[in-house]
Amino acid sequence: MATIKEIKELLVTVKELESPIFLDLEKDNRSGVQKEISKRKRAIQAELDENLRLESMLSYEKELYKQGLTLIAGIDEVGRGPLAGPVVAAAVILPKNCKIKGLNDSKKIPKKKHLEIFQAVQDQALSIGIGIIDNQVIDQVNIYEATKLAMQEAISQLSPQPEHLLIDAMKLDLPISQTSIIKGDANSLSIAAASIVAKVTRDELMKEYDQQFPGYDFATNAGYGTAKHLEGLTKLGVTPIHRTSFEPVKSLVLGKKES
């Protein structure tokens, strides 16, 4: 009779729920064996579910594949809402039918998985571009226009250049055909890939700014208006990376000028 360890090693090789190996092992009454069978079945089902989820997130890409297009860039940004730091956009071209396990809207990926999935995108992407527009430009042109500039910069870095753009809720004035998708980072794998690249890139920048400007908790809040950030603003004032067109930073700057 096989040991439970041997059965466990055998089950790792099973890839289908209908495998005859399950039927054979289910005759074994040992609770440890039954536990391993259940565990492996759950793992196989999870893999099937994940594959279906990834498949559903390729629907926009597959429509474009049918038209003979393969160089499809997903575009997304991170950092529209913070009081400090840049807006960062990424453009990513994935290989045809590329599925990266765990890839999703960056807001839905557990923080501890960010770097792992970011690295998987880096490893598998055909091309990646990153656009960073700082707070001074944001204050000059407004955050909406700055976001467009960041996206255009990211796209300009792609080589080869894309045949079509899938963009998260935005239209760009570029001579490339494009599709604007509401909640694109949750509905397109290409946009989701751009989402995690932009997110990790910006988070790393904000960690560097946290070293440069301690007291605002930038490493944790990424420039968003958390209680610790607002406390830092009150105690320490405005830094060179704060967006002076955003409240409450704007009022703090005006108050300082008037005093």
UniProtKB/Swiss-Prot annotation:
CDD domains, A to Z: RNase_HII_bacteria_HII_like
One MF annotation (Gene Ontology) recorded for this entry: RNA-DNA hybrid ribonuclease activity
Cofactor(s) of this protein: Mn(2+); Mg(2+)
Class of the enzyme per the UniProt entry, highest EC level: hydrolase
InterPro entries: RNase_HII (IPR022898), RNase_HII/HIII (IPR001352), RNase_HII/HIII_dom (IPR024567), RNaseH-like_sf (IPR012337), RNaseH_sf (IPR036397)
Protein EC: 3.1.26.4
Annotated RNase H type-2 domain residues: 70-258
Protein name as it appears in the record: Ribonuclease HII
Gene (UniProt): rnhB
